Amino acid sequence: MNYNPNKNEIEFVNNALEKFNNMHVGPDNHLLLNIVEYDENQNVIAGILGGTYWGWLHIDILWVDENFRSKKIGSRILIAAENEAKKRGCHSVHVDTMSWQAPDFYKKHGYELISELDNIPNGYKKFHFI
């Protein structure tokens, strides 16, 4: 057993799973969906990073600079990502967030909590929304 596989071995495992998945459900047609927002000096002040596949948008990261929070920037880029996902044929969104991050933000936007993990890290929670 190797706890530090090289790049080729990692790629082999990824490709093997992709081939297996494709045999069962067809290609995922994964496309990145990344959006950033700038201030007046073209500095990045917010971003959403994710991708679309199998009819879903997965949000990996949604971040807004602390100096620009409570100005609807997060809402604006979330809605922009949702709209782009719909253009790509997506029917749903899923996202994870931590208890100190943005669970209330996603609830405010109509997301439904579907699971919660305790003590990740110790004393905190991880939430999964759709």
Label for each model-derived stretch:
Residues 1-11:
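A short beta-loop-alpha structural element at the N-terminal edge
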Residues 13, 106-107, 111:
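Conserved active-site tyrosine of GNAT-family acetyltransferases
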Residues 45-46, 115:
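A structural microfeature
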Residues 28, 39-40, 48-57, 62-65:
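A conserved beta-strand-loop-helix scaffold within acyl/acetyltransferase catalytic domains
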